């Protein structure tokens, strides 16, 4: 459960992300593909090379979805219901991949926001991404 302090931290961090959400999403995906090569199996139709338009496009989707989740932190299941359905029923993504992408997102944010990425912000973002992951895998059961 996200505390009021967590919510404040998450909103403050996401305000710093701002218009870079898509770029950071794409960078996190690239990190995930490089660090965890098995995740590439879900993107056989993508050009996974550095800076590819397809990775950038999917990174924007990731960034937009997270922005939507930040805006609806008090109703993550409602805000992410369609994405949960898509990943569980159509794409059939292994739930562990959400944790891997979350880790890569944290690394990416730490690289781009070193002054703002305090231990408290890190902890709040980690809890938030874990909550998002939990919602995304909720339809698997």
UniProtKB/Swiss-Prot annotation:
Presence of keyword Phosphoprotein: yes
Entry GO MF terms: haptoglobin binding; heme binding; iron ion binding; organic acid binding; oxygen binding; oxygen carrier activity; peroxidase activity
PROSITE patterns given in the database record: GLOBIN
Family annotation (InterPro entries): Globin (IPR000971), Globin-like_sf (IPR009050), Globin/Proto (IPR012292), Hemoglobin_a-typ (IPR002338), Hemoglobin_oxygen_transport (IPR050056), Hemoglobin_pi (IPR002339)
GO cellular component, one term: hemoglobin complex
Residues that hold O2 according to the record: 58
Positions of post-translational N6-succinyllysine modification: 7, 11, 16, 40
Gene Ontology annotations of biological process type: hydrogen peroxide catabolic process
Entries under Pfam families matching the protein: Globin (PF00042)
Location of Phosphoserine modifications: 3, 35, 49, 102, 124, 131, 138
Keywords of the record: Acetylation, Heme, Iron, Metal-binding, Oxygen transport, Phosphoprotein, Transport
UniProt tissue specificity: Red blood cells.
Residue numbers carrying Phosphotyrosine: 24
Modified residues (Phosphothreonine): 8, 108, 134
Positions of the Globin domain: 1-141
Role noted for this protein: Involved in oxygen transport from the lung to the various peripheral tissues.
Family per similarity comment: Belongs to the globin family.
Subunit structure: Heterotetramer of two alpha chains and two beta chains.
This protein's name: Hemoglobin subunit alpha
Protein species of origin: Myotis velifer
Gene responsible for this protein: HBA
